[in-house]
Amino acid sequence: MAAINRSTDMTTGSIWKRMVSFAVPVFLGNLCQQLYNTVDSVIVGKFVGKQALAAVASSGNLIFMMTGFFMGLFIGAGIVIAQYFGAKNYEKVRAAVHTDFAFALCCGVLLTLLGVFFTPTILTWMRTPADVLDTSILYFRLYFLGSLATILYNAGMGILQAVGDSRSPLYYLVISSAVNVALDLLFVGAMDMGVAGAAVATVISQVVSAVLCIIKLTRSDGPYRLEIKRIGFDLPLLKKITSQGVPSGVQNSIIAIANVVVQSNINTFGSDAMAGCGSYSKVEGFVFLPITAFVMALTAFIGQDLGAGQFDRAKQGARIGILCSMAMAELIGVALFFLAPYAMRLFNDDPAVVAIGVRQSHIEALFFCFLAFAHGVSAVLRGAGRAQVPMYTMLGCWCILRVSYITLALKVWPDIATIFWAYPITWSVSCVVFLLYYLKADWVHALEKSL
């Protein structure tokens, strides 16, 4: 039985309605994912303790460093599929879908091997405190055993979003989130499995979401239907996908590596700092919900409209998406600024842990609009086929500048707040660069020669 075709042609109709109708399911899906990630940390922090919380809550930067490059590759696949879908070239859509999945299988196996074998080395390089190291190694190794499922889900989700279907991934995230929370309570709360239970619960939930996404694609009646026997490489399309995806992957890796350097400096302040900053990172994740929602909407919208030659419509959509993302991110930032003490106590009641999380919130929260602007322009440029521009901007501002600032500033002001200021400073500088390029460059006609 064929699944309901929920793809959306974003080249017609009200720009505002198309953008919001796409972004809202992405927002809700990411909200579910962020909630279960947060509940993961809350359960570990309450049932196991602050050392375990430090291991789990501070995991985001390392996980993103290991997975970010691969996720970027599948952003490239989504861009290519969106462009062909907008141009009504459905034969290319079919070929790109099967190339995407063949690539995902290879990347998933590679990431699993890298995560399992290199986790101890990376955690040692990150100067993880001795009282947290063994727990962190156990958590990460178990987590990375689910890498194949994570990659396959992201590949499938990217395909669905590229053709305008943001609702199906929402349903799958709701289901997997419920599975994760239930298993957390069972494994960590009832069975006392500690961080191992949290990791196993996460892996199982990732497998559930991947299976649901694959079933959806194999039962679709649209041009993006997945046929298992047709999975294989179309080399010209693989080259096109990687030409779009590698810059996005490198951009993710740049951000992740810089953040791992930040985390390694935080680790030198001890497990209280790790737990406090880890708690903050979980709360900060809610800020990324509107940003990510409009980033996904912008990438699909710009890709489809430029693929269809709707250049003025693409410009209007870019403005609407970026402004909405900035407004929502800043609203959440203001709320976090005032509610930080209450938010941090959800994870752990230790006064030292709470104080560090609150301090980071008060330094960074009011600058979230700059973060949203940078990600919004990046999404527009990727959708327009100019993924190299955000890659180089992030390399200069979010990697080289951020790491240089921390390295030099800590020698003058050896305080953890010095580290926290790295983010607002580098977000602001990148915004200036992006604004100049966005206003001056003719990014909107980048695809005319390739489609």
What residues fall within each predicted segment?
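Transmembrane helical elements of multi-pass membrane transporters/channels
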Residues: S21-D40, L142, Y153, S176, ...
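Hydrophobic transmembrane alpha-helices of multi-pass small-molecule transporters
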Residues: M65-G68, N180-D184, A210-I214, F286-L289, ...
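Small-residue hotspots at the loop-to-helix junctions and early N-terminal turns
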Residues: V48-N61, S136, F140, A199, ...
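Small-residue-rich hydrophobic transmembrane alpha-helices
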Residues: L53-L113, F117, T150-P169, Q263, ...
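Residue-level signal for short hydrophobic patches within transmembrane helices
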Residues: W16-L35, V39, L62-F69, L145, ...
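Short alpha-helical transmembrane segments in multi-pass integral membrane proteins
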Residues: M1-A23, I81-L148, A190-V246, I302-F367, ...
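Helix-terminus/linker motif at the lipid-water interface of multi-pass membrane proteins
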Residues: L35-A54, L123-A130, L186-M193, S253-F286, ...
